[in-house]
A protein has these predicted regions:
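Carbohydrate-active catalytic/glycan-binding domains of CAZyme proteins
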Residues: 21-292
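Bacterial N-terminal signal peptides that target proteins for export
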Residues: 1-7
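Bacterial Sec-dependent signal peptides at the C-terminal "C-region" and cleavage site
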Residues: 7-24
Length: 292
């Protein structure tokens, strides 16, 4: 016969079992005890392994390379894919070599606003990936006004198509960050060899979206790959307000072409990725993978 004291003990045990402390070792099965909404989402919408069970999951570390001097008036950033051609590694990147340091809104015709202002596209080579030799002159130099990208060109990436080489990069026709944010769209240069000479098109190949659309103010970080026999050029886009008034801050889209010089047609599914600051895509199995 159950007494009142026995009933109280049973209820207390049930209570304790229902509200036991969550263990340090994450259970592979969803706990039966009451858990927070965040833990519920871990099991219902994600998984307790997080990314560690993804076959692409990895770690990396920074390592020092040689061949690039350091200076307050020199900026190197936004490296392209590194490609290996006839035993030589090639990389292209944004490079600013100016008389002064970036001055923000005090920028002038000769003083940059930011690290990506008054830049050209530079090229370096290496036999081992550790020791690099920078070319004495830019691979692609800004064209004269009013050609596209006369103020600055940056964030390049390389495409090899039918034995020719194509560098896609964003071009600025105004001082970055002064009037309308980092307003830049994508243009391209072509060459017969990775050593150049490079011939800039001087025109936009992937343009801004219409006013009010998600990519109306920025087409940044072009990342071309070949997929299904076509050129898939991924890019980062942002609207004119860039997060103000509830607008999207940034996302990633793709434009597709059968010719490196275009026309590029934006996907009807854009934006295809709603997070990530830079574009980094690569063919993977039967599709495409992204680092975001």
């Amino acid at each position: 016969m159950m007494t009142r004291s026995n009933l109280i003990i049973v209820i207390n045990l049930l209570f304790l079992n229902s509200y036991a402390d969550f263990p340090a070792k994450i259970p592979m099965e969803k706990p039966t005890q009451k858990v927070s909404p965040a833990v519920e989402r871990l099991y219902d919408e994600w998984n307790p392994h997080e990314d560690r069970e993804n076959e692409l999951y990895s770690n990396f570390k920074y390592s020092q390379i040689n061949g690039f001097e350091r200076s307050k008036t020199i900026s190197r950033r936004d490296p392209s894919k590194i490609i290996l051609i006839d035993g030589v590694y090639h990389v292209w990147y944004t490079c600013r070599k100016t008389a002064g340091v970036p001055a923000g809104k005090n920028a002038t015709e000769n003083i940059p606003s930011f690290d990506w202002d008054l830049c050209d596209i530079w090229h370096a080579t290496s036999s081992d990936g550790w020791h690099w030799i920078e070319d004495p002159e830019p691979a692609v130099t800004r064209l004269a006004k009013p050609n596209y990208g006369w103020r600055s060109i940056s964030t390049t990436d390389i495409l090899i198509w039918k034995n020719k080489y194509y560098l896609y990069y964003q071009g600025f026709n105004e001082i970055p960050g002064i009037h309308s944010g980092d307003r830049a769209a994508v243009t391209v240069a072509e060459a017969e060899s990775p050593y150049g000479p490079w011939k800039p098109l001087g025109e936009v190949v992937v343009d801004f979206g219409k006013e009010g659309e998600w990519d109306s103010n920025a087409i940044h970080d072009p990342n071309p790959i070949i997929y299904d026999g076509k050129i898939y050029l991924y890019y980062k886009g942002s609207p004119q307000k860039g997060g103000k008034g509830g607008t999207l801050i940034r996302a990633q889209g793709v434009a597709i072409a059968e010719n490196p010089l275009g026309p590029f047609v934006k996907s009807d599914l854009n934006p295809i990725i709603n997070s990530g600051h830079e574009t980094c895509m690569f063919p993977w199995k039967k599709g495409v993978a992204a680092i975001v």
